[in-house]
Amino acid sequence: MKLSYNWLKDYLESDLTPQQIADAMTAIGIEVDGVEEQEEVPGGLAGVVVAEVLECEAHPDSDHLHVTKVNDGTGDPLTVVCGAPNVAAGQKVLFARIGAVLPGDFKIKKSKIRGVESFGMICAEDELGIGNDHAGIKVLPADAPVGTSAKDYLHLKTEAVIEYE
């Protein structure tokens, strides 16, 4: 069976760590298989940050793609090709940097889309595993701080789970 550490803390006043609780369970004769960390969203959205769309123009070789310049808080703006119909300059968005792995083991790589190099991905809710909306990218409030990790901005939790017999 699995026991949520956060659920347990709702009922017990204790400063014990998940591993200390597992050790105490073992000490009283409960067979504990281990303690594992589980992200609220698979992968914890590592490599996904709040970014700002600085520029947005029609792609020269497509009637539905846009070429954007994105500030992800690391320095020079990045060129990103985006197919979302609602992307516009001035928006704060969730941006997956090169190397990020989205739910479904989708790894973000530098790519060339119809002749334009793209250095990341502006994401919709369903692509991040935080909702079902795929009508367009997730647009954040104007005060969203550029460079903040998506995990921190969205207040996603890491859950410790104790597995026992």
Predicted regions and their residues:
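Phosphate-backbone binding interfaces of nucleic-acid-interacting proteins
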Residues: M1-E165
